[in-house]
């Protein structure tokens, strides 16, 4: 749909009229496109003569001639004046009433939107959509009227201008769509506005991805409406959420033909006099000229001292007396369109909202961020570099990683650089730039002319610029200039860079201008670019800003491979390195208890954990010990850099999470304060900036302050320093046998070290068999080759397995961080082993649907290699080429930068295994971030996520989410994995498991059928599919699937256990017992399947009354695994049913200590034991808790977010009825001595007080159990008498048939003996069944040389599986598990 015409009689004057048409700028986008929205009352605008105040804006247009008149009293942008139009005005309804403030802000918002439209580059797709023929005609006239040969200014269409005038009011819901009816607005304009509101509503939708929403808008809305809504959304800047900003940015990119923003292109084509106007307007606010485009992080352009209170001594004086929005230039920065070339800087805390002098702001921590157009030159800013350079200590300007120079007056651009924490970005071959400290140099490639680049559609590329001031006292080091360069910079004619003019060095000039803003003591600058890998022109400009100047190709490769890992994992992200420093009387200590006087630096990858108990919080890296915290108060905090992925550029912020343990909802003791604001357990992450203060606990005994660092800490260097590998290297050089024995490790010889270096697989196996010797070898190897990522990964996996809680797990996290750091730095990646390549081929379906003869070898660059799994089945022993045995660090010379592979399979494996480690430590948020980072790295493979090994990472992630009950998280992970790995069988099985848990059986069956089509023998599939069919009611098909599974996998005890459960649920107890016995003969005592088989079999036998066999199974299992919660719960149940209540209570307490208080089975069993003891108050309290936990699990299974389910759980436990139960239970616990009088102290039960004393001796459940036992005894006695009578009859018949005499007597005795053990002659009832295994070897039984294994089943057990006659007993569930009556509540 094209632009719709507007009636020619309509003319709109927008300004401060005598009656005041009022609207207001809204800071969030909430779409109001429905008629049911609340309507606001309006006051109409009289067509009288308008009156303008200072700074007011007038926008008028005449529809007949399509002329636009835009004037701004205080501003730097002026459109060509037009003759004032004549004609009628828009007659607004008189029922509308707005305030004066709303009117002013609406006028300003509309003028900015019209300015954004007029700045669209002539001929661009956006200009064609929003201006059209009218805009082209007026632009032509404007071009002839204006001076110099500048680009014509496009003019909005009349209907677009009318819609722009009304869109702010509709967005802010001052007007509803229904208010447009009545004839006062043209129907075409009203339709355009409706579609624009639909686009706004799509931007706030969180049920679909951003790309899907953008596609929907492109398909269902007209292009002019989408373009108008996108420009309006981009104008909102920091007022919108990050997801909405990403939506509007992508929509603009789609509408603009995939190129850069037309507004930036228009800014690039402006004339020098227009830049002079902008510069004069900027200097009025005391700012240095620079372009700011990245609106998502425009908030960092504000002063961090004024954004938060109580951050430093300088900011404490002002407190909250001033705010960012109170500054005029700050408010302008927030309200400006992101595509406009704005000028932004932070206000000084002492400015108090007043205009300051031109120059840098002394109180700004973060100065600006922005997108630097490739063809815009800020030549006037280059001259400010030398003028504003400080002279600290009598020397020249000093910047950490920043060097800018230039001379004004000659118009020649000068070179300046921003160095990223001592590292440099990748550059194209043949580039050169001015040398920066920490980087090399190389000749600069001759760039293409500006016209050619514009024709190629590359007007600008996104980049982000971050300037920070980490320390107010330390002086930065002096910059390093290249040889032969003068201290005051290059010559003004640009001789230092031949062939480059001012137009080609625009990004350098912008960086020099930005560096001048930080002129002052301690003013280093960090630059991080957000560029695509195939964007050559943008990377060329970004590499100059990153200080990646290189002198030759060899040094270029070495510099690119030795970059600091602290920022390489955050390439494309803006972040500020920080550390945590103690400001209280209690010092911060490391995991070993040693004080940290310099604080604890926050690494850019992974979390750090601070707590006061390393046993409760494994992996604690910072100990808090004040010796005054009450017992039971477990304080812990997690700090981690989090990337906001909802925004295209990925904002990065250091966030704090309160992960303390709460006991009985005592949240006050676990509260934390960030700048005086409380952060409770379970709250979302709180973003932190330098200067923030953190206090712990109710007494605030621990206090810390965040300080910025000049560069991010390196995980590799920190690990080498903490592990003292340099000392091992020096000692090994002096002594051939090394000094491993000094640290308690065995001595290793040089031959062992050489053998381990040549065979990495044997070293990985040794890490499992002999961890001390493997650690000694790893120390020796890493002392010689600290950059070998495979060695670090083997050590990290070994530490995660063998190290205990506390310092051990913190050491494992440090090793994983070093492995990831080393993997990023490796110049040459070895090819993955053949096993990993074959696994990747199976994941991509190459072995089933592609040509069978495809090569399975990988090239040396690692692009064809893939990681198969991220769990224990794929460890770092695959880091060495099995054919050559060469180490990654032993490669012959680094390759050229262009030869470095995009996909790093070692990094995928390091991040994936690190995520596993964090998940085991219950750091679920950190584990999710690491899984996501591993999947993103795997997706860089040329074959996609599946070929890069990401499918295994996503499968492990989804499986852990499903085990935790997070069905919605698991569904999201499985859906994404299936989209990217459509031929992975394991992912289809995972999706079926998720839908089975959510009770979507038909969908689960569909996933099972897809997986079966890919692989007909998958073991995991046969664990899920029969359960799905049984849930759908097809029992025969479920049994058939189990039989097929056992035919394909006869030794799989998981399948056997699942089959036995199915038979037990169907009532086939004999078949279930046979299957349980078969599984235990294969795997009797393993901690996984063996324990579950025993627990399930013992539970079934207990329900059937065969307590002897159940006790035998449980005692054997508990002897091997005394802390198994599953066995302890069944054992408690058995003791309870037999009347031994104290033993049952002790067993269930042990189970609760292992499984926790949120295990429904454990807590339900404890409630049953307490009810059997007669403790009604305690039982009712636990029953309430169990019902709340079950409701929590049901909500998670139904697809609710975990936060929603927990919120409902908390609300359910805070009702008056529940509080009454809790109070009664606590009073009785105090009476029994099970709870201390003072919370936090250890309970001291009085002597002689036992649970159940003085109460009913037997609960109703016990009485029912005794009645059941009596009926079973009577039944056995009746069967015994019947068997004896039958035996006598058979004996008499045998004697009569033999004809009497001795032969008859012998036959009668034989018949009697046979009948006594026959089908009706046994003492216990029915005839036993033959459960002898014909071929034990077939089922994997290790017979050895001795007799067959002892049988688990006996003949007398058969009576519990078959009941030929009914004894009129109630169901077992009704007998064993009575519901609580009115007395229990």
UniProtKB/Swiss-Prot annotation:
GO terms for cellular component: chloroplast stroma. Residues 1356-1365 have a biased composition (Acidic residues). It comes from the Eukaryota. Residues 132-157, 263-282, 304-360, 387-502, 546-568, 726-756, 840-899, 1237-1257, 1333-1385 are annotated as: Disordered. Its main location: plastid. GO terms for molecular function: mRNA binding. Keywords: Chloroplast, mRNA processing, Plastid, Repeat, TPR repeat, Transit peptide. SMART domains: HAT (SM00386). It is found in: Plastid, Chloroplast stroma. The keyword Repeat applies. Residues 271-281, 1374-1385 have a biased composition (Basic and acidic residues). GO terms for biological process: mRNA processing. Part of 2 complexes of about 600 and less than 2000 kDa, both of which also contain non-polysomal RNA. This is PsbD mRNA maturation factor Nac2, chloroplastic. It comes from Chlamydomonas reinhardtii. The gene is NAC2.
């Amino acid at each position: 749909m094209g632009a719709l015409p507007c009636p020619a009689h309509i003319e709109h004057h927008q300004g401060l009229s005598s009656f005041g048409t009022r609207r207001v700028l809204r800071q969030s986008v909430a779409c109001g496109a429905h008629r049911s929205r609340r309507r606001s009352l309006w006051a109409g605008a009289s067509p009288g003569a308008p009156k303008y105040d200072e700074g007011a804006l007038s926008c008028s247009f005449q529809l007949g001639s399509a002329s636009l008149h835009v004037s701004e009293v205080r501003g730097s942008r002026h459109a060509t004046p037009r003759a004032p139009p004549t004609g009628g005005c828009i007659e607004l309804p008189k029922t509308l009433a707005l305030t004066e403030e709303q009117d002013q802000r609406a006028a300003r918002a509309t003028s900015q939107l019209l300015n954004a439209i007029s700045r669209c580059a002539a001929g661009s797709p956006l200009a064609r959509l929003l201006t059209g023929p009218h805009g082209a005609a007026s632009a032509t006239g404007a071009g002839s009227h204006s001076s110099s040969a500048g680009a014509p200014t496009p003019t909005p269409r009349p209907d677009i201008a009318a819609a722009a005038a009304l869109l702010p009011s509709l967005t802010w819901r001052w007007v509803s769509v229904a208010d447009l009816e009545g004839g006062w607005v043209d129907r075409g304009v009203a339709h355009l506005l409706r579609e624009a509101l639909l686009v706004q509503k799509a931007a706030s939708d969180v049920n679909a991805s951003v790309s899907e929403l953008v596609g929907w808008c492109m398909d269902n809305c007209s292009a002019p409406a989408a373009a108008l809504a996108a420009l309006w959304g981009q104008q909102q800047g920091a007022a919108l959420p990050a997801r909405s900003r990403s939506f509007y940015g992508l929509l603009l990119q789609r509408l603009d033909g995939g190129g850069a923003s037309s507004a930036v292109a228009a800014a690039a084509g402006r004339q020098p006099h227009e830049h002079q106007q902008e510069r004069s307007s900027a200097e009025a606010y005391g700012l240095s000229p620079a372009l700011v485009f990245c609106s998502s992080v425009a908030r960092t352009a504000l002063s961090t001292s004024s954004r938060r209170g109580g951050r430093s001594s300088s900011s404490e004086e002002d407190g909250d007396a001033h705010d960012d929005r109170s500054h005029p230039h700050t408010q302008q920065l927030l309200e400006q369109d992101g595509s406009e070339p704005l000028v932004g800087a932070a206000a000084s805390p002492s400015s108090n909202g007043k205009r300051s002098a031109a120059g840098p702001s002394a109180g700004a921590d973060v100065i600006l961020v922005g997108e630097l157009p490739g063809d815009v030159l800020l030549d006037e800013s280059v001259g400010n570099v030398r003028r504003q350079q400080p002279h600290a200590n009598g020397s020249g300007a000093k910047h950490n990683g920043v060097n800018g120079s230039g001379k004004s007056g000659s118009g020649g651009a000068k070179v300046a650089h921003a160095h990223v924490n001592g590292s440099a970005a990748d550059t194209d071959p043949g580039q050169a730039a001015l040398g920066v400290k920490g980087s090399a140099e190389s000749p600069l490639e001759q760039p293409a002319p500006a016209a050619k680049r514009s024709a190629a559609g590359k007007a600008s590329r996104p980049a982000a610029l971050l300037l920070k001031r980490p320390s107010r006292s330390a002086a930065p080091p002096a910059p390093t200039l290249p040889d032969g360069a003068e201290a005051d910079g290059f010559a003004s004619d640009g001789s230092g860079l031949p062939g480059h003019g001012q137009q080609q060095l625009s990004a350098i000039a912008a960086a020099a201008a930005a560096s001048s803003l930080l002129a002052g003591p301690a003013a280093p600058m960090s630059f991080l670019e957000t560029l695509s890998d195939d964007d050559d022109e943008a990377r060329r400009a970004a590499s100059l800003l990153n200080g990646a100047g290189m002198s030759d190709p060899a040094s270029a490769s070495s510099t690119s491979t030795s970059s600091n890992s602290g920022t390489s994992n955050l390439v494309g992200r803006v972040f500020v390195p920080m550390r945590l420093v103690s400001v209280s009387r209690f010092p911060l200590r490391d995991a070993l208890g040693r004080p940290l006087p310099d604080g604890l630096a926050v690494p850019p990858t992974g979390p750090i954990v601070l707590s006061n108990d390393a046993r409760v919080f494994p992996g604690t890296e910072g100990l808090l010990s004040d010796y005054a915290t009450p017992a039971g108060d477990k304080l812990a905090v997690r700090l981690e850099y989090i990337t906001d992925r909802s925004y295209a550029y990925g904002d990065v912020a250091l966030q704090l999470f309160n992960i303390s343990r709460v006991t009985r909802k005592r949240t006050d003791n676990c509260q934390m304060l960030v700048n005086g604001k409380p952060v409770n357990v379970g709250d979302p992450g709180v973003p932190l900036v330098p200067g923030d203060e953190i206090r712990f606990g109710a007494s605030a005994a621990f206090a810390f302050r965040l300080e910025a660092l000049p560069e991010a800490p390196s995980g590799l260097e920190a690990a080498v320093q903490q592990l003292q590998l340099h000392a091992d290297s020096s000692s090994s050089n002096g002594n051939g046998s090394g000094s491993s024995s000094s640290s308690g490790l065995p001595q290793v010889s040089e031959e062992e070290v050489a053998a381990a270096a040549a065979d990495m697989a044997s070293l990985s196996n040794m890490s499992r068999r002999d961890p001390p010797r493997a650690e000694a070898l790893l120390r020796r190897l890493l002392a010689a080759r600290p950059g070998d990522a495979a060695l670090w990964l083997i050590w990290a996996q070994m530490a995660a397995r063998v190290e205990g809680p506390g310092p051990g797990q913190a050491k494992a996290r440090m090793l994983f961080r070093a492995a990831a750091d080393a993997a990023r730095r490796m110049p040459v990646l070895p090819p993955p082993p053949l096993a990993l390549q074959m696994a990747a081929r199976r994941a991509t379906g190459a072995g089933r649907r592609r040509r069978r003869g495809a090569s399975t070898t990988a090239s040396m660059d690692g692009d064809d290699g893939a990681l198969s799994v991220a769990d224990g089945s794929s460890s770092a022993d695959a880091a060495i080429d099995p054919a050559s045995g060469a180490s990654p660090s032993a490669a012959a010379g680094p390759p050229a930068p262009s030869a470095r592979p995009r996909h790093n399979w070692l990094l995928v494996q390091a991040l994936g295994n690190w995520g596993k480690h964090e998940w085991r430590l219950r750091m679920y948020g950190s584990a999710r971030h690491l899984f996501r980072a591993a999947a993103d790295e795997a997706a860089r493979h040329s074959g996609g996520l599946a070929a890069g090994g990401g499918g295994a990472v996503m499968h492990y992630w989804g499986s852990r989410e499903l085990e935790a009950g997070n069905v919605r998280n698991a569904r999201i992970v499985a859906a994404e994995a299936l989209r990217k790995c459509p031929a992975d069988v394991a992912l289809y099985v995972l999706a079926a498991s998720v839908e089975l848990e959510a009770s979507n059986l038909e969908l689960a069956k569909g996933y099972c059928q897809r997986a079966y089509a890919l692989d007909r023998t998958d073991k995991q599939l046969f664990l899920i599919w029969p359960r799905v069919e049984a849930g759908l009611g097809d029992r025969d098909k479920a049994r058939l699937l189990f039989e097929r599974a056992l035919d394909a996998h006869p030794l799989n005890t998981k399948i056997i256990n699942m089959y036995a459960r199915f038979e037990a649920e169907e009532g086939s107890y004999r078949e279930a017992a046979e299957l349980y016995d078969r599984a235990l003969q294969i795997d009797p005592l393993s901690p996984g399947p063996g324990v579950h088989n025993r627990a399930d079999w013992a539970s079934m036998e207990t329900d059937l009354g065969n307590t002897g066999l159940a006790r035998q199974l449980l005692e054997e299992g508990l002897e091997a695994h005394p802390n198994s919660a599953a066995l302890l719960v069944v054992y408690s149940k058995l003791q309870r049913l037999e009347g031994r209540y104290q033993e049952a209570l002790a067993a269930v307490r042990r189970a609760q200590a292992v499984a926790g208080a949120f295990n429904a089975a454990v807590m339900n069993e404890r409630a049953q034991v307490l009810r059997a003891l007669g403790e009604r108050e305690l039982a009712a309290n636990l029953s309430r808790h169990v019902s709340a936990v079950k409701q929590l699990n049901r909500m998670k299974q139904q697809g609710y977010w975990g936060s929603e389910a927990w919120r409902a759980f908390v609300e359910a436990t805070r009702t008056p009825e529940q509080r009454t139960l809790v109070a009664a239970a606590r009073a009785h616990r105090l009476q029994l001595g099970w709870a201390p009088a003072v919370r936090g102290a250890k309970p001291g039960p009085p002597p002689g007080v036992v649970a159940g004393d003085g109460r009913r001796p037997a609960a109703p459940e016990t009485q029912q159990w005794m009645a059941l036992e009596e009926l079973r005894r009577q039944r056995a006695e009746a069967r015994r008498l019947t068997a004896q009578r039958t035996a006598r009859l058979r004996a008499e018949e045998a004697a009569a048939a033999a004809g009497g005499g001795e032969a008859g007597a012998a036959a009668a005795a034989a018949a009697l003996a046979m009948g006594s053990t026959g089908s009706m002659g046994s003492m216990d009832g029915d005839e036993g069944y033959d459960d002898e295994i014909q071929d034990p070897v077939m089922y994997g039984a290790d017979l050895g040389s001795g007799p067959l294994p002892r049988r688990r089943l006996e003949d007398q057990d058969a009576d519990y599986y078959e009941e030929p006659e009914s004894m009129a007993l109630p169901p077992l569930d009704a007998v064993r598990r009575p519901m609580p009556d009115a007395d229990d509540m």
